[in-house]
């Protein structure tokens, strides 16, 4: 029996809403990455973009356990000598509330063109408001 593959533009897609308030950072990111890839669908294929769209709200209230709020560091490099910059979790949340979640999700997606395309299907918002009411997102518990 042959395996049936969806064409990427014909694959049925849904919109999901995840409230990250008080939820662990890694669990929210793992659930989101799986939904973006489409691993919850029977038609999953690792080389296709057939996943769903995910809207995450309250990203600024995402939880980390232990001392990670002050000990977890995020590094960026400008490319110049001595251009390494570091900031801890609390500092990054204060500066860019959605960034820790985006970094965690990006790390859980495939590297390369497919992963970059999948990352465009997630929308992360710091507060409880989002502009995707018209898509009627389905609320998902993490």
From Swiss-Prot:
Keyword Protein biosynthesis set for record: no
PROSITE patterns: RIBOSOMAL_L13 (PS00783)
CDD domains registered for this protein in UniProt: Ribosomal_L13
Molecular functions per Gene Ontology: mRNA binding; structural constituent of ribosome
Quaternary structure and partners: Part of the 50S ribosomal subunit.
Similarity-based family: Belongs to the universal ribosomal protein uL13 family.
Function of the protein: This protein is one of the early assembly proteins of the 50S ribosomal subunit, although it is not seen to bind rRNA by itself. It is important during the early stages of 50S assembly.
Protein name: Large ribosomal subunit protein uL13
Organism annotation: Treponema denticola (strain ATCC 35405 / DSM 14222 / CIP 103919 / JCM 8153 / KCTC 15104)
């Amino acid at each position: 029996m042959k395996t049936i593959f969806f064409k990427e533009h014909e694959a049925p897609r849904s919109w999901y809403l995840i409230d990250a308030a008080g939820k662990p950072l890694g669990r929210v990111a793992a659930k989101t990455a799986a939904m973006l890839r489409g691993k919850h669908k029977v038609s999953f294929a690792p080389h296709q973009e057939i996943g769903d769209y995910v809207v995450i709200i309250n990203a600024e209230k995402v939880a980390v356990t232990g001392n990670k709020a002050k000990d977890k560091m995020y590094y960026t490099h400008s490319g110049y000598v001595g251009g390494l910059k570091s900031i801890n979790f609390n500092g990054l949340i204060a500066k860019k509330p959605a960034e820790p979640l985006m970094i965690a999700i990006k790390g859980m997606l495939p590297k390369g063109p497919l992963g970059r395309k999948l990352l465009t299907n997630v929308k992360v918002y710091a507060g409880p408001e989002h502009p995707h009411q018209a898509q009627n997102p389905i609320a998902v518990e993490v």
